[in-house]
Amino acid sequence: MFESKINPLWQSFILAVQEEVKPALGCTEPISLALAAAAAAAELDGTVERIDAWVSPNLMKNGMGVTVPGTGMVGLPIAAALGALGGDAKAGLEVLKDASAKAVADAKAMLASGHVAVMLQEPCNDILFSRAKVYSGDSWACVTIVGDHTNIVRIETNKGVVFTQADNAQEEEKNSPLGVLSHTSLEEILAFVNAVPFDAIRFILDAARLNGALSQEGLRGSWGLHIGSTLAKQCDRGLLAKDLSTAILIRTSAASDARMGGATLPAMSNSGSGNQGITATVPVMVVAEHVGADDERLARALMLSHLSAIYIHHQLPRLSALCAATTAAMGAAAGMAWLIDGRYDTIAMAISSMIGDVSGMICDGASNSCAMKVSTSASAAWKAVLMALDDTAVTGNEGIVAHNVEQSIANLCSLACRSMQQTDKQIIEIMASKAH
């Protein structure tokens, strides 16, 4: 059995990917609130009649302008209502996957009657916070999610507290597979990818299946800003070359188009984000097809991409002013570089050039325009790989890029953790002013 060949560090890598790379239907911030509402509704015997919800500013930012799958509507109120009336609390990020047409109609009716209120949680010390309190007659139930999109920390009803997360949860995090990433390096990740038995990582091919299907859907329909299908038309008009670079751009943006436009297909997410999962997957798939990679090579490249993206994102807040499609694309750069020449130096140079290129891109909330940023990040990743293949990269003499890739990553993440906090507040203020 392959288990005997896997050391504890490698096992932690595999578990980290299994924990962070999951199917998700719909943008994960409104889905987090939908999950809270579904979990609260599951505690009641009767039908939910009213919902009060509270979210953190960052969750509000990412939930204001994005379409909830199957509804044709944007925003947190419809997500909360559909979660309460048609959600499956056991399905995690796919909480809305089995929502019926009747549940959608009932959710819209609940909104029209003014029985759904979504408010900012103030004060709020948590980047990711969602709380849903649902009412049925004289009964109520309240569920709170903190820190991660599916991390339920408290369940309470009018009869008392049903569940509360253990106080030692933070200590357990340090020893978790994700906690191990704080003490590893890209070199160790590459060594793992090169040597781990294929059967142990075969599961990552599901990312190619799910995100590939989203890409195809994006090219077929007019989802979101339909960037992918629009650029494909420009190829037919002779305004864009039909080459590998364009294929990466079109197929990656098409998947994000479908994702953000409300397609009822799941994305394989990364670090709690469907767009990050798309960005870490589709460019690698396109290059793998170009070089004729078999399933094993594709799986290793995808594992390198996703694990590198998780490794970088683990040094960031769960939500921030930094567009994390950029960090996911750094993972994609690693995966694409590995497919072509496999050298650590090429991978490190590509990531460093990415940090010198797109590190200033802001996150101004989840919306159709995320597909623009996904396509920009994917294109930048391929450009960085092409440079690295010729031993060219942004060097430690320039900007925030350091003389080694690990310090470059640390420099980038320090911006999001500290100096970009004020940027985040300003973005939220601007978006809130537009809502009035």
From Swiss-Prot:
<dbReference type="InterPro" id="IPR021144">
    <property type="entry name" value="UPF0597"/>
</dbReference>
<dbReference type="GO" id="GO:0080146">
    <property type="term" value="F:L-cysteine desulfhydrase activity"/>
</dbReference>
<dbReference type="InterPro" id="IPR005130">
    <property type="entry name" value="Ser_deHydtase-like_asu"/>
</dbReference>
<comment type="similarity">
    <text>Belongs to the UPF0597 family.</text>
</comment>
<dbReference type="Pfam" id="PF03313">
    <property type="entry name" value="SDH_alpha"/>
</dbReference>
<dbReference type="GO" id="GO:0019450">
    <property type="term" value="P:L-cysteine catabolic process to pyruvate"/>
</dbReference>
<protein>
    <recommendedName>
        <fullName>UPF0597 protein YhaM</fullName>
    </recommendedName>
</protein>
